[in-house]
Amino acid sequence: AGINCLNESHFSDTTPCLAWMMLYEEGRLIWGCEADTLSMATQFILHRALNTPIMMTNLYPSLMSGPALKHERIPHFPDVSAYADPNPDNYVLVAHCGYFGLLPPSFGATWTMRPKVLAIVDENAHAIDARFPTGPVTLAKLHPSMTKLTAVEGTLEGYAQYPGSDCLNGGVVHVPDGHRLVRGATSHHYLITTGHNLNDMQMAMKVFGVGVEEM
């Protein structure tokens, strides 16, 4: 199930986040934010094939930090100097609708419902503040041509908070080559799974005759 929950938010006095999470927990119904059918198709296929926690979020590579600063209303990109790779080029801020992303309680290391963050939605709306456990993750999305899946394994190093912004709790993901990710990514909307799942994704996509391109 999916609706254009942001751009058509004026039709409702709330957001569908909690309803979608309840529907997933009750019947494993896959949800789609912002009417992104390609993300929803990717999420459906990978979740059914791999049976791993997965959600859609926004990617903000450090190499393109300008849009992140503007879109999320944050003053600077997260400080990564304390991580194993101190090169900021190889990091991505991941955030969606004020927090890390929309995931059900069974996927989260922590999970809390919060008041809305974005100005575009009704004052009665809500958002989900949840986290994956830190550690290995995989970013993936079907290419618009539907002929290949773009994917990369990385590490969720931690979280960054920016009070008063549109990113109250975002994830900080390390990837092997930030330049390669920027060249290969097809959208700012991407799926993120727990664990390193590239090999399993290659096997699953082979069933559908779909290739896998590593970013």
Pin down the residues of each PLM region.
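Anaerobic metallocofactor- and corrinoid-dependent redox/one-carbon enzyme cores
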Residues: 2-215
